[in-house]
UniProtKB/Swiss-Prot annotation:
Gene3D superfamilies referenced in this protein's UniProt entry, alphabetically: Glycosidases
The keyword Disulfide bond is annotated on this UniProt entry: yes
Protein name: Myrosinase
Matches recorded under PANTHER family: GLYCOSYL HYDROLASE (PTHR10353), THIOGLUCOSIDASE (PTHR10353:SF231)
Amino acid sequence: MKLLHGLALVFLLAAASCKADEEITCEENNPFTCSNTDILSSKNFGKDFIFGVASSAYQIEGGRGRGVNVWDGFSHRYPEKAGSDLKNGDTTCESYTRWQKDVDVMGELNATGYRFSFAWSRIIPKGKVSRGVNQGGLDYYHKLIDALLEKNITPFVTLFHWDLPQTLQDEYEGFLDRQIIQDFKDYADLCFKEFGGKVKHWITINQLYTVPTRGYAIGTDAPGRCSPMVDTKHRCYGGNSSTEPYIVAHNQLLAHATVVDLYRTKYKFQKGKIGPVMITRWFLPFDESDPASIEAAERMNQFFHGWYMEPLTKGRYPDIMRQIVGSRLPNFTEEEAELVAGSYDFLGLNYYVTQYAQPKPNPYPSETHTAMMDAGVKLTYDNSRGEFLGPLFVEDKVNGNSYYYPKGIYYVMDYFKTKYGDPLIYVTENGFSTPSSENREQAIADYKRIDYLCSHLCFLRKVIKEKGVNVRGYFAWALGDNYEFCKGFTVRFGLSYVNWEDLDDRNLKESGKWYQRFINGTVKNAVKQDFLRSSLSSQSQKKRFADA
């Protein structure tokens, strides 16, 4: 009789579990409050799925104990470009000395992965290995990695997250010159030799699209190059916005592929994996009934994703880019094409927003032309009916507001699986910012970030289940509040609150507590978002939902 009762109980629990799994519904339309996904948890993704947080060296470490990098040079030369508050990464979370605090926060979250970057100029202050290696930098990263492994947190290390040693920029304009390939290889070789016994997931370059476009086309990011008339305030120190982005992108791909080849040959015995990180977006037709808008959306996909993914899968640039860009687009030699094609074990995909695409004439040649115009596409966050995609993502009175669309992550993952051969994928960034003008209580009561994370995780689970996309991990951006590129300290992205007046004062925000429960698998029967929202808006901000 006891056996029958036991079997019945097991059956009921299994049935309840299946029912709960089936009841998870992703909200398809604005406002994406995630009220129907309160039972979503890590258990819906499989036991080996990695849930972590992410950061980058320049944004959290501070300037102590390293050489000067291009973001130091850029932010001091053009402080207004580094952030409207005129601040920079000289002093931020000071993770170089407070790394244990970061690890403690990750332990509190029960994170199983941490994506962070090495500061090239901390390890090799003058850029080239031949000019000396900083033992203090090596020791710092060893201590951090050892502390992570002690807590069973898997390190994902990015070799280059935009902070190129300034010496290499001064000598030959960094990625604009092929000399960078050997210097990047030497730097990577040192890192593999020094840390490869502990680190099994390597990322070569973060967001291949960003430095060529923002750094060399429009000059809004380091190193800040562009054509004279692209920045009418003449704050670019030189450049050609029509040609340099394609050269930089080409050299990035060759540097990436060279490092992957090094890892696969010289360090194969370490049994790790290596790949690049892509910034992704989804592009919807501005007018779904207009063939020109539909064509513009796909053309944007080719210029945004295909620019890198076609070489990485086929060894050549997309046909549409070759047709439009012409001689401004470099060519791969046969040997280079073979080197680049297939040069990844996994892809890291960063996803934040979706945009509407409509045709726009390409003004080339002109004094104000940039490579970003070659697609002949205008991007907006509202469609032909004046409808916005979703809730506010970033308020920007100068450049215009942006809005987010959780289902976009579903479309992006399916697109990469279908078009690029079903790669192994890690979502290496996904996150939401709030304004730093909020007071402490408001910043900690970040229910909007819970909505953002929860709704995106819901669609990520959905695309894995429905389309069989091979996603093995998700990293929320960011571990804690930090310096944001081009925004300074005017926004907060963290799951943990950082008090800039007392850097040891850090607390999990409500989003951090939610993510903690999500990872633990204890969000079933959690309080509804509406109740959470009203509670967090009240004066009882300090109330903990430990039973949620």
